From Swiss-Prot:
<protein>
    <recommendedName>
        <fullName>Fructose-1,6-bisphosphatase class 1</fullName>
        <ecNumber>3.1.3.11</ecNumber>
    </recommendedName>
</protein>
<dbReference type="GO" id="GO:0006094">
    <property type="term" value="P:gluconeogenesis"/>
</dbReference>
<comment type="similarity">
    <text>Belongs to the FBPase class 1 family.</text>
</comment>
<dbReference type="GO" id="GO:0005986">
    <property type="term" value="P:sucrose biosynthetic process"/>
</dbReference>
<feature type="binding site">
    <location>
        <position position="219"/>
    </location>
    <ligand>
        <name>substrate</name>
    </ligand>
</feature>
<dbReference type="Pfam" id="PF00316">
    <property type="entry name" value="FBPase"/>
</dbReference>
<feature type="binding site">
    <location>
        <position position="225"/>
    </location>
    <ligand>
        <name>Mg(2+) 2</name>
    </ligand>
</feature>
<dbReference type="Pfam" id="PF18913">
    <property type="entry name" value="FBPase_C"/>
</dbReference>
<comment type="pathway">
    <text>Carbohydrate biosynthesis; gluconeogenesis.</text>
</comment>
<dbReference type="GO" id="GO:0030388">
    <property type="term" value="P:fructose 1,6-bisphosphate metabolic process"/>
</dbReference>
<keyword id="KW-0119">Carbohydrate metabolism</keyword>
<feature type="binding site">
    <location>
        <begin position="86"/>
        <end position="89"/>
    </location>
    <ligand>
        <name>substrate</name>
    </ligand>
</feature>
<dbReference type="GO" id="GO:0006002">
    <property type="term" value="P:fructose 6-phosphate metabolic process"/>
</dbReference>
<feature type="binding site">
    <location>
        <position position="83"/>
    </location>
    <ligand>
        <name>Mg(2+) 1</name>
    </ligand>
</feature>
<feature type="binding site">
    <location>
        <position position="85"/>
    </location>
    <ligand>
        <name>Mg(2+) 1</name>
    </ligand>
</feature>
<keyword id="KW-0378">Hydrolase</keyword>
<dbReference type="GO" id="GO:0005829">
    <property type="term" value="C:cytosol"/>
</dbReference>
Length: 280
């Protein structure tokens, strides 16, 4: 596992340089879900794949930017699903973006996730590693240095409501309105990584990306985005649910499956579960 962490650190330093100097324009290609790929997406993906190819403990990888699993080392122990540059469309307006890694054993599903890592590329570069606990590192003088352990409070103050609002179910809209009426502050940039990172560092709150009329199964991808952050939130003392159960109990049938998801401290997630139980 240690060599995987070092590989992610190496990729993060290279992607940092790419963000600072690379072309932010669109490519002529689409990814597996039909989104037009930015040149930064393709370049970031290649950086990570090229580094992972040299790690004997990695059996296979799959990128959000690619359709299929890439087999690497037959005797490897770990499978890695990753989003090379989540929120890449925010780079050209100079907002924070990130990379997300889910590390699995045996097969790609929630029950087999053993660790996760995400990297935030903002004014500073920070890396959060989740195994049995949640540790944050910061890039200082070219090296990642341990800063702190992360723990959530029982109740937070931030609300980050995602997806297209005119496609929300009425009860979901009422839930979000009620949370704001209770004094929560809006914190939503459109980047999953910095928004979830902020809630973790500020002690708690709610990030929601529900099923909607146009996307009943949600938009965020299980293996690449949802499960890695679910592990982080649970190990930090919070919860991650799909509205009814832990997202780490969700079954994956295809590597690019999506799911509705809610991440937060216990008070907010219990509120979500209560509302969804009554209305669905």
């Amino acid at each position: 596992m240690q060599e995987i962490m070092k590989a992610i650190e190496e990729s993060a330093i290279k992607i940092k340089h790419l963000i600072e100097t690379g072309d932010t324009g669109k490519s002529e290609f689409e990814n597996s879900t039909g989104d037009t790929q930015l040149k930064l997406d393709i370049a970031s993906d290649k950086i990570i794949e090229d580094i992972f190819k040299n790690i004997p403990s990695i059996k296979a990888i799959v990128s959000e930017e690619q359709e299929a699993i890439v087999n690497l080392h037959e005797n490897g122990k770990y499978l890695i699903a990753y989003d090379p540059l989540d929120g890449s469309s925010l780079v050209d307006v100079n907002l924070s973006v990130g990379s997300i890694f889910g590390i699995y054993e045996n097969e790609f599903n929630a029950q087999n996730i053993v660790a996760s890592v995400y990297v935030v590329f903002g004014p500073r570069v920070e890396m959060v590693v989740t195994t049995t606990d949640v540790k944050m590192y910061r890039l200082l003088d070219g090296k990642f240095t341990f800063i702190q352990n992360i723990k959530l409070n029982e109740k937070g103050k931030l609300n980050a409501p995602g997806s297209t609002q005119n496609c929300w179910a009425p009860f979901h809209k009422q839930l979000i309105d009620d949370i704001f009426n209770d004094g929560y502050r809006l914190r939503y940039s459109g980047g999953m990584v910095p928004d979830l990172h902020q809630i973790l560092l500020k002690g708690g709150g709610l990030f929601s990306y529900p099923g909607t009329s146009d996307k009943p199964k949600g938009k965020l991808r299980q293996l690449f985005e949802v499960f890695p952050f679910a592990l982080a939130y649970e190990k930090a003392g919070g919860q991650a649910v799909d509205g009814f159960k832990r997202v780490l109990e969700v079954q994956t049938t295809h590597i690019h499956d999506t799911t509705p998801c809610f991440f937060g401290s216990n008070s907010e997630i219990n509120r979500v579960l209560e509302v969804y139980k009554k209305n669905v």
